[in-house]
Amino acid sequence: MMMRLLAVWLAVAVCAGAQTTPDPIVFVHGNGDDSAKWIGIIGLFESNGFPADRLYAVRFTNPSARTQDHVAEAGRSSTIDQVSELSATVARALLETHAKKVVLVGSSRGGMTIRNYLRNAGGSAVVSAAVLCGTPNHGVFAVGTGLDGEFNGNGDFLRGLNEGSEVVDGVRMMTLRSDKLDKFAQPDGRAAGLFEHTGVTFEGPALQGAENVVIAGADHRELAFSPQAFRLMYRFITGKDAVQDRVTAEAHPVVSGLVTGFAGKNATNLPVSGVRVRVYPLARGSARREGAALYDRTTDASGVWGPVVLDSTVEYEFELEAAGHDVSYFKAPVPRSTALMNLRLVPAAADSARGKGHLLISRPEGYFSAGRDAVTIDGALTKDEPAGLPVKDSFVATVPARVDGVKVQLRGETIWARPSEDFATRLAVVDLLW
């Protein structure tokens, strides 16, 4: 009997020893973006049992690249700026989790920063795997001028990353690319506002020696922020298939974030003080505010807003007010707690549609194409959505100026929003997650 009990105890001990804690994941956003881009993907990882305290997201101070990497430009960052901030986030993740290595997941420019970190900043010693999503590894264009540009495939930076082996010994690497809809991997760049002959191909994001996967029909951002991309990165990182492909809701998520703004025309992730942040619950099936603001505070020098406890079945309006200008973000019900709900104070602008009801329909995690993405307003297809190659992440829709608002839908996501009649004083944003 004792021998049998001992055998059972040993078997349990062996199984327990085999259950290793996963390496923490650091998510790395792209050009002009911020850490909030990863809210959906992080929610999917958590919903599949990945420990929430081992999921990190870097927030680059000045996320937009310089025109010339070695020439200082206000509100923009160099490749060294980027890799320095990534290195600091990795160091923090290792210290807090006591892990030996991390996994890095990067979108677009974030993938280039990951490669720079692995190759030139000692990152290969502390990284077990890397996933590069829509990263222009061979350039957005490859031309003979502007060789100090970060995105030039013939330039100094990318040639340095690609010479010799395109992957790094000891680090498992996967790339995700589109078959033909990535705006930054186009032989003809005119639709994206680039050269007619870019010198790059649809295969540009792939790397020799990596596991290269194609997501057919995906646009540039969907290669990082879509459920399809999640399933691929989850299997690559964990070695098993994800069970949940939708975010599992908490009853009362706790939400907070940072108010950010602009430096000239460049979006930054620097905190903005003196912004009044109000969070209003909306009546079900309407964009009408239901009662007083659930949260009402003015940001201090830290720019931090929240935390606020929400109901995951209720839609909310997140209103920013500063210097007589309002920005209202209408979002679908927030399913899980996050400290990454950063809200950008978009500057006031002249409004050519003043006097009519209109909304800014925004899709930060993807792009729009009328032939592919059926955006409906009150059940009818909108005529304002851009068509063709998906290159735009927002568009202005003219809608009825109703007090109760209109219903906007895309890919199963529904958001009620109250239109604006003058964007110069109040910008109304439908902020889609997927």
What annotation goes with each model-predicted range?
Residues 25-31, 42-46, 51, 57-167:
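Serine-dependent carboxylesterase/thioesterase catalytic core
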Residues 175-177:
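Short beta-strand/loop motif that positions the catalytic acidic residue
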Residues 35-41:
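The serine-hydrolase catalytic nucleophile loop
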Residues 263-265, 283-296, 300-434:
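Preference for solvent-exposed, low-hydrophobicity sequence contexts
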Residues 218-226:
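Catalytic histidine-centered segment of alpha/beta-hydrolase-like enzymes
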Residues 265, 270-282:
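Hydrophobic beta-strand segments
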Residues 234-254, 263:
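Beta-strand-rich domain onsets/edges
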Residues 3-14:
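Sec-dependent N-terminal signal peptides
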